[in-house]
Amino acid sequence: MRTDAQTEAALLHILECFCSRFAARDADGVMELFAPDADVVMVTSEEALLRGTDEVRAFLRRYVQRPTTYSWTWDRRGVSAAGTVGWLLAEGTEGVAQADHEEKHPYRMSMVCEKRCGRWLLLQVHGSSPHHE
């Protein structure tokens, strides 16, 4: 379901905030985007499945202590919504940088958000690298 321009802009803003804060190693800033619910979910390439704000926060705190930095650029972004629930799919490239080298590979990220009290919040984030044979 296509959405109105205001909702599309708000959901794309969530994506951009998530990515820029993650790349900046701003764990608290990333957490501000999530709903304060016990059943939020984040799936990353490093961890099988993170459930709840405690697991997501612990993962982010570990991430900021490590030498690897992740960043993303998006070639395509699609946004849909129905009422107070919105979702998006972004397709592009993930950068994985360490002190001595950087890798780039195809990446996809999807998000499910809910609007509460006039603010869009993350409920689920799923990131994955497609495998090509």
Per-range role (PLM):
Residues F34, G92-E94, H126-S129:
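Short beta-strand segments enriched in hydrophobic/aromatic residues
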